[in-house]
UniProtKB/Swiss-Prot annotation:
Protein name (record): Probable dimethyladenosine transferase
Subcellular localization, as worded in the UniProt entry: Nucleus, Nucleolus
Catalytic activity: adenosine(1779)/adenosine(1780) in 18S rRNA + 4 S-adenosyl-L-methionine = N(6)-dimethyladenosine(1779)/N(6)-dimethyladenosine(1780) in 18S rRNA + 4 S-adenosyl-L-homocysteine + 4 H(+)
The protein's assembly and partners: Part of the small subunit (SSU) processome, composed of more than 70 proteins and the RNA chaperone small nucleolar RNA (snoRNA) U3.
Annotated S-adenosyl-L-methionine binding sites: H30, L32, G57, E78, D106, N121
Broad class of enzyme this protein falls into: transferase
InterPro entries: KsgA/Erm (IPR001737), rRNA_Ade_Mease_Trfase_CS (IPR020596), rRNA_Ade_methylase_Trfase_N (IPR020598), rRNA_adenine_dimethylase (IPR011530), SAM-dependent_MTases_sf (IPR029063)
Length: 306
């Protein structure tokens, strides 16, 4: 039976190639061909018959068809009009056709409809903005099961002190619970990518954390510019101080509050870091609670990062 499935997948892929459709690596078009990987991804998403599923980059529809068989509806977002047409043709005149909605265009620019789950073999070049578009979407979805480049996936789950721990790690973990599900080798794709892949499960925190994400992202962006430097050294950088001073003066102006006569942004920032016992800390070893406390201290003093 597995041989029949494999032959069917190969035939569909070959039919696409015979029609002159060349897979575009600029769009990250590496088609997932292993049905066992697809089955595992669907199982880990706990897909229900009542679910609306969002898929980004459906390609030739190997995973799309499997989801259509189980879900109430699949919304497939595809930037390549050729593949979008092939996907629609694949389910044409079948019971699956009414359950498929194809959105043609750039996912990052699209206005997302309601969905319960997101399951996708993600175009790797849009991985980071894709994650935050999903996690900042409202209403919250239940979970996402996504295929990423392996190193990117490892960054998502990295903890303070890990070599790969970075701004991506802490920003994602602020908004969601992140779990590594499995590794997927290059030979599971056609054409095979140059890198290894991994599947990750994201479950948005509900309720969301009580923090302005724009402010949070501004703080972590500065802190992780040089994650091995102390915060005291990082916040002495001229461009950082100029940005914070501009924001501070605007904030005071909007509140009709005068600027202190002896005001110096560097002194104010260092004073806050020392009060929080964080002047000697480095971003590489700081967790979510550390950054929450630091952001609250800065904001309470009128220092903003947006």
């Amino acid at each position: 039976m597995p041989k029949v499935t494999k032959e069917k997948k190969s035939r569909i892929h070959n039919d696409v190639q015979k029609q002159g459709i060349v897979f575009n690596k600029d769009f990250g078009q590496h088609i997932l061909k292993n049905p066992l990987v697809i089955t595992t991804m669907l199982e880990k998403a706990a897909l229900r018959a009542t679910d609306v599923v969002l898929e980004i980059g459906p390609g030739t529809g190997n995973m799309t068809v499997r989801m259509l068989e189980r879900a109430k509806k699949v919304i497939a977002c595809e930037i390549d009009t050729r593949l979008a047409a092939e996907l629609q043709k694949r389910v044409q005149a079948t019971p699956l056709q009414p359950k498929l909605q194809v959105l043609i265009g750039d996912f990052l620019k699209a206005e997302l409809p309601f969905f319960d789950l997101c399951i996708a073999n993600v175009p790797y070049q849009i991985s980071s903005p894709l994650i935050f578009k999903l996690l900042l979407h409202r209403p919250l979805f239940r979970c996402a099961v996504l295929m990423f480049q392996r190193e990117f996936a490892e960054r998502l789950v990295a903890k303070p002190g890990d070599k790969l721990y970075c701004r991506l790690s802490i920003n994602t973990q602020l908004l969601a619970r992140v779990d590594m599900l499995m590794k997927v080798g290059k030979n599971n794709f056609r054409p095979p990518p140059k890198v290894e892949s991994s599947v990750v499960r994201l479950e948005p925190k509900n309720p969301p954390p009580p923090v302005n994400f724009t402010e949070w992202d501004g703080l972590t962006r500065i802190a992780f510019l040089r994650k091995n430097k102390t915060l005291a050294a990082t916040f002495k950088v001229t461009s950082v101080l100029e940005m914070l001073e501009k924001n501070y003066k605007l904030y005071r102006s909007l509140r009709n509050e005068p600027i202190e006569d002896d005001f110096k942004m560097q002194d104010k920032v260092i004073s806050i870091l020392e009060e929080q016992d964080m002047a000697a800390k480095r971003a590489r070893s700081m967790d979510i609670d550390d950054f929450m406390r630091l952001l609250l201290a800065f904001n309470s003093a009128g220092i903003h990062f947006n």
